[in-house]
Amino acid sequence: MQTNLLKPKIISVEALTANQAKVVMEPFERGYGHTLGNALRRVLLSSMVGYAPTEVAIAGVVHEYSTLDGVQEDVVNLLLNLKGIVFKLQSRDEVIINLRKEGPGVVTAKDIDLPHDVEIMNPDHVIAHLSAGGKLDMQIKVEKGRGYVPGNVRQYNDEATKIIGHIVLDASFSPVSRVSYAVESARVEQRTDLDRLVMTIETNGVLSPEEAIRQAASILVDQLVVFAALESSEVSGDLAPSRSSMVDPMLMRPVDDLELTVRSANCLKAENIYYIGDLIQRTENELLKTPNLGRKSLNEIKDVLAARGLSLGMKLESWPPANLEK
């Protein structure tokens, strides 16, 4: 009797548009099409890294319910239009860019003054309409992130450093616009009870649909490898590792995997903190003594660790493990 599960392979990747593709994978054992299709779809929609405007300061505007003379849109619609711009940062995690234009005319994304390593994927996106005498002068902060972060959450976290007149935006970082999947019947030789998984993926241009599904699969593998590392309780004698010698694989991952800001990451490396296991053993007071690492960076580190069920000041009995690369 056949006991090995069939391993699927990608049959075809069909480009429907510049940013949309259909990926067909088969064969799957019966039921695995829905199992993996749903998991991939959820990861694609929630866990892809992208870029979004997170904060804006507009000359003459104190809050989002204001209006500007000579600008057709009110500030609320202006902010909605700003959030529709698709940014791509090449070598940094955040940037502050400027937009200055006088009317009459249409203000589009290509009017933004960009550094050499920042790209706009939809330069014709309309931001505002200016009449004669109208003027638009703003600073936009763009950051790297994952998923969706409401503005009020970011505002509370940054309350101590908030500047009057700076408007915090809801940030949708995900570069994946739409994902759908369908499961069809497939056949291999005499077996007709197999699944074919058809996924349709649309992105905003920051990454291709093919790259998106590769990243989603890597995230799933990275999450599931922890379960594969579980030791059987039936192993006994010298073959059974002691509880104290077993280290959570999460702690052996580099701090770069936490996706901290460049400033925070560089401060940690300057203190020879290369792994998550190194980091969680430090206390808040120890980190605050690190040059250039302030309260804001400390809060960022604490939030990132908390999202993974970790915290500062933890004790590890068997750290560093013998197999940890120096």
From Swiss-Prot:
EC primary class: transferase
GO cellular component, one term: DNA-directed RNA polymerase complex
Domain of life of the source: Bacteria
Molecular-function annotations in GO: DNA binding; DNA-directed RNA polymerase activity; protein dimerization activity
One record GO biological process: DNA-templated transcription
InterPro entries tied to this protein: DNA-dir_RNA_pol_insert (IPR011262), DNA-dir_RNA_pol_RpoA/D/Rpb3 (IPR011263), DNA-dir_RpoA (IPR011773), RBP11-like (IPR036603), RNAP_asu_C (IPR011260), RNApol_insert_sf (IPR036643)
Segments for region (Alpha N-terminal domain (alpha-NTD)): 1-231
Function: DNA-dependent RNA polymerase catalyzes the transcription of DNA into RNA using the four ribonucleoside triphosphates as substrates.
Domain free text: The N-terminal domain is essential for RNAP assembly and basal transcription, whereas the C-terminal domain is involved in interaction with transcriptional regulators and with upstream promoter elements.
HAMAP family: RNApol_bact_RpoA
Protein family membership: Belongs to the RNA polymerase alpha chain family.
Protein name, entry field: DNA-directed RNA polymerase subunit alpha
Source organism: Polynucleobacter necessarius subsp. necessarius (strain STIR1)
